C-alpha cells in the first residue's frame, strides 16, 4: 500500500515552472549531456489519458441477461435522423454520421462518424429488437431471448449388470 498514487510516467513529467527553468538553463548552457530525461521522452507520454478526455461513453453498456439482451450507447452528439441501427449476420450495427458543419466558435468545421458493432448471442430473437433514443441522447436497444435448453428434469435409471454365479467366478480365478 502506498500513500501516493504511482504513475510510471510521472518520472518524465515536471511542473510548468520546472520545465521553464530547465529549458532556460538548457538554452543558456546548451550542455547536451545534462538534459533532463523528460526532454527525450516519447511524444505519446505527454498526451492526456483517455479518462482525462471528454469523449463520453464510446463503448456503450452491454446488458446480457437470462431473458433479454440490451445495449446502451451515448449518442448525444447526433440527431435521430443521423443514426441508424441494423442487424447483419448476427451482428448489431449502430452507425451515426453527420456531415461537415461549422463549429460553434466559427474557427473550423466538425464532422463526426462512428460505427459500433456488437455480436448478438445465439438466443436473441432478431424480430424482437427495438430501439429507443432518450431526450438525453442515450440510445437503448433491447431484444428478447428464447429459452435455451429448458427441458423438464427427469431421473435416469441406472441399470446394473447381473451378478455372475459364484461357481463361474471361482473357475475364472483358477
From Swiss-Prot:
Record-stated family: Belongs to the small heat shock protein (HSP20) family.
The keyword Protein transport is annotated on this UniProt entry: no
Example GO biological process: protein refolding
Domain sHSP: 50-161
Biased amino acid composition, Basic and acidic residues: 161-174
Coiled-coil residue windows: none
Gene3D superfamilies on file: 2.60.40.790
GO molecular function annotations of the record: unfolded protein binding
The organism of origin for this protein: Onchocerca volvulus
Keyword terms, alphabetized: Stress response
Pfam families: HSP20 (PF00011)
Residue ranges, annotated region (Disordered): 153-174
Name recorded for this polypeptide: Small heat shock protein OV25-1
GO (cellular component) term, any one: nucleus
Record keyword Transport present: no
Amino acid at each position: 500500500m502506498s500513500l501516493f498514487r504511482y504513475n510510471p510516467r510521472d518520472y518524465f513529467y515536471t511542473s510548468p515552472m520546472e520545465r521553464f527553468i530547465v529549458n532556460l538553463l538548457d538554452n543558456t548552457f546548451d550542455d547536451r549531456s545534462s538534459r533532463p530525461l523528460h526532454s527525450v521522452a516519447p511524444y505519446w507520454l505527454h498526451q492526456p489519458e483517455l479518462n482525462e478526455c471528454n469523449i463520453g461513453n464510446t463503448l456503450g453498456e452491454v446488458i446480457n441477461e437470462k431473458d433479454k439482451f440490451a445495449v446502451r450507447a451515448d449518442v448525444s452528439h447526433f440527431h435521430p435522423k443521423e443514426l441508424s441501427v441494423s442487424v447483419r449476420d448476427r451482428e448489431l450495427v449502430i452507425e451515426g454520421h453527420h456531415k461537415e458543419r461549422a463549429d460553434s466558435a466559427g474557427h473550423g468545421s466538425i464532422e463526426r462518424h462512428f460505427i459500433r458493432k456488437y455480436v448478438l448471442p445465439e438466443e436473441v430473437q432478431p424480430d424482437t429488437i427495438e430501439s429507443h433514443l432518450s431526450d438525453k441522447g442515450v440510445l437503448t436497444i433491447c431484444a428478447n431471448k428464447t429459452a435455451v435448453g429448458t427441458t423438464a428434469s427427469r431421473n435416469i435409471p441406472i441399470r446394473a449388470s447381473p451378478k455372475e454365479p459364484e461357481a463361474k467366478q471361482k473357475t475364472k480365478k483358477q
